[in-house]
């Protein structure tokens, strides 16, 4: 989404987005996605300096931006999110490489659920890449959260251009 109206996105809507996002399945029910809502002008300026120039104004005018991150410490909460399999999870996740890979995979999956939840509630999304190392230093330094995606959200202004081509079934699937 290139432009958004000035209609506000409420805290109740943000809560509902989170709740819908976390209904989707993840391996081990791990739920490694973390969401940082960017709502203040000060936080937004800290965010936009880590975006490419073409996306900075889009982010500035969006009612809300979300930084989606994976939590490398997700295993520490296994007793909460999957108490029946907590020991299995810990026995599987024995290296930092495995823990990080699982966190990234789960958070990427949840990022898709996130954008689907936003759209299901009648809002629009604009996913953006960023300087993720810079975002880490800016917002998450010293924590186990590592950003993977920035998403602008709000009520979109219809564009004058038609939707770009989407691949068809035969272009992207095969049956064996």
Write out the residue ranges for each language-model feature.
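Short, flexible, mixed-charge acidic loops at enzyme active sites
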Residues: 78-88
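Short beta-strand segments
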Residues: 67-69, 129, 152-154
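Small-aliphatic-rich amphipathic alpha-helix that forms the alpha element of a beta-alpha
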Residues: 21-23, 66, 86-137
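Short coil/turn connectors at secondary-structure junctions
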Residues: 60-64, 123, 144-147
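N-terminal amphipathic, basic helical "cap/leader" segment at the start of enzyme domains
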Residues: 1-77, 175-176
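Acidic, glycine-rich active-site loops and adjacent beta-strand->loop/helix elements
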Residues: 41, 72, 131-134, 157
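Short proline/glycine-enriched turn/loop segments at secondary-structure junctions
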Residues: 137-143, 163
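C-terminal helix-cap and adjacent tail motif
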Residues: 1, 147-176
